[in-house]
A protein has these predicted regions:
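Sec-dependent N-terminal signal peptides of Gram-positive bacterial secreted proteins and lipoproteins
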Residues: 2, 6-30
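Conserved functional micro-motifs across diverse proteins
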Residues: 26-165
């Protein structure tokens, strides 16, 4: 091999190694995690578990809107960090399709058995309760979504728990 060809191959190899290193460095971004009912999801600050979903025929004096069904599931959140944090029921988005309007939040708690609006959790403490949401009658899956927000305001990892209806 000539000196010129050797230098070219050496330069090409260096460029390829640099490109591979840059590609691998870009792979450290946010990730998505999917789970199913009764599986514990581990975020940076807490663990959460969503129980099996069930469809309710009614609840107290609530009237179920035409074309919808009332879905309930039990949720537990445990602070696994070393600091106290507030947990909000609205931190968890409910999704039931791919459309722009196929999402919502759980209902305002109507009883003490329901997940509270907000709770301050010390390290190791847990909060639990039932979440209820109206979804279209034809929805077959309810997905509970949580998006981490980093200290700099950027989105971190996201987590999805798929519940069969």
């Amino acid at each position: 091999m000539s000196k010129k060809a050797f230098k070219f191959n050496k330069t090409l190899l260096c460029v390829l190694i640099l490109a591979a290193a840059l590609l691998l460095a870009g792979c450290g971004g946010a990730k998505s995690t999917r789970a199913k009912a009764d599986e514990t999801v581990h975020t940076a600050l807490f663990d959460f578990t969503c129980g099996q979903a069930s469809t309710l025929e009614g609840f107290g004096s609530l009237e179920i809107p035409e074309g919808n069904k009332l879905v309930q599931f039990h949720m537990t959140v445990t602070n696994t960090s070393d600091e106290t944090y507030e947990i909000f029921k609205d931190d968890f988005q409910m999704q039931w399709g791919d459309g722009d309007d196929d999402f919502g939040i759980a209902m305002y708690p109507l009883t003490t058995d329901m997940f509270p609006i907000e709770t301050e959790l010390a390290p190791g403490d847990s909060v639990e309760g039932d979440m209820m949401v109206y979804v279209p009658t034809d929805a077959a899956t309810l997905t509970v979504a949580y998006q981490e927000v980093l200290g700099n305001g950027n989105d971190g990892n996201n987590f999805f728990v798929d519940l069969s209806l």
